Amino acid sequence: VSFIGSGNVAWHLAPALDNAGFVVKEVYSRSPQNAALLTERLYQAEVKASLDFSTSASSIFILAVSDDAIRTIAQEIVIPEDAILVHTSGSQPITELQFAATQNLAVLYPLQTFTKNQKIDFKSVPLFVETHTQEAERVLMQLAKSISNEVKKIASTERKALHVAAVFASNFTNHM
């Protein structure tokens, strides 16, 4: 597994996968310092200096980046031909990845607000999966079930509605 992004989602998701037995090999971030901080929390990960992963041993590439960066990174990233490209956004459709050089596209959406210094039990975080191929579905469902007890398949339109409702509920609760 390789991560693109080192923000709040990556800060929690990468160690959860590492602890579940998925080796996180590389972390790329616009900020190499932030990538280095994340790799310190992982067993074998190294900082990656560019989006050229053509020689990577990873088979899963997770874009844990801002919504507006997904499409640009999907267009620029170079990954092995059969690799799976995943984004973690609740509001962006899987089609944001369509310009990538792979057909194995997926979304892994954790229904959770993440803060770097907040401890989270990932087993209780609901994960929602959407994929374009059977192979991506098989791999992503296995990955998701290894870190969460609540895994469901969901389409982009349903995921966006769920995300909007969750944001509304969270903001309403915070406002009270």
Region spans (language model):
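Hydrophobic Val/Ile/Leu positions in short beta-strands of Rossmann-like dinucleotide-binding domains
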Residues: 2-3, 63, 129
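Rossmann-like NAD(P)(H) cofactor-binding subdomain of soluble oxidoreductases
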Residues: 32, 42, 46-119, 140
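NAD(P)+-binding Rossmann beta1-loop-alpha1 motif at the extreme N-terminus of oxidoreductases
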Residues: 1-48
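Short phosphate-binding/catalytic loops that engage adenosine nucleotides
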Residues: 22-23, 103, 149
